[in-house]
Amino acid sequence: MELQHIKDNVYYLRGVINIGVVVGEEGQALLIDSGLGDRSGRRILRALEAEGLKPAAVLNTHCHGDHSGGNTYLVEQAGAKVYSPLHDAVILRQPVWGTLCLFAGADPIHELAIPRFSLRPSPVDVIVTEGELTVDGVTVEAVALPGHTGTHTGYITSGVFFLGDALCSEQELENAGIPYGYSVTMRLDTLQKLQNYNCDYYLLAHESLRRDIGELVELNRKRVEETLAFIVDYLSRQPAEASDVMVAVCEHFGLQLHNRGQIAFKIEGNRLLWYVDHCGGTGERSFNQCKTTAYMS
């Protein structure tokens, strides 16, 4: 990781997850997110130390492990303070709630116990709310951008807007088809809100630096509205259960839920049989080798 200058005292560490860096007058560094796991925390710390900087705080955009997994390492090794939005702080402090939510309240299967979903518990020193925030002598503006999570938050300083996962890049939209979201309503409201900002630079978590996001905001909005329109049209032609709607949406957008080979399904009579292999395998096992079978009528 190498420090990339954006403008004034604002930088970022480019990677699979871009880490924002705001530098104070005394060499203190405010980080926007911390990457995935201890390895990311270690790489961030080394990159900062190479520039004579010390991480004073991590400002998390949200709780997902690829954005907050380095928190605990930076707290333990550098004494960094952690700032987080309210709902996300619950999962940072007790990550099990995140995996429980993903698995409908049940004990999560083995595949969910990976750093992206099952990070180390992180302390949270300050709950972030929308408005001006001064951290160790450095002032930033916290902007509520819910949708990806319930309290997802972006940060602005010196005309640079750190967006976290509030926007998906063109490549992400192509890969995911339908991006993950906590609330479609919140996502649409956030996309509308983003049109009101005129910053010098915008940094997406998984994309390169941009000078303008107008077209990307519209592309994100269009994808959400296309999905909603398809669902409304589908349900206007016949009543359907949620599982039928899910299948129809996946077929319409060419999505596959079993592309990693960890979860597969087939229809037998009136039952949907889910075969979940949580032995840590490669995904190449046949159905009869799976350890767990759940039946859904």
Question: Model segments located where?
Answer:
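Divalent metal-coordination and catalytic microenvironments
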Residues: 9, 22, 33, 48, ...
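Metallo-beta-lactamase
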Residues: 36-37, 132, 139-146, 150-228
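Conserved beta-strand hairpin/beta-sheet module of binuclear metal-dependent hydrolase folds
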Residues: 1-51, 154-166
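Active-site HxH/HxHxD metal-binding segment of metal-dependent hydrolases
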Residues: 42, 46-132
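Conserved HGGG/HGGXW glycine-rich cap/lid loop of the alpha/beta-hydrolase fold
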Residues: 11, 67, 144
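Conserved beta-strand segments of alpha/beta enzyme cores
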Residues: 2, 11, 81, 126, ...
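C-terminal regulatory/interaction regions
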Residues: 230-297
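Residue-level marker for buried hydrophobic side chains located in beta-strands
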Residues: 30, 59, 82, 160-163, ...
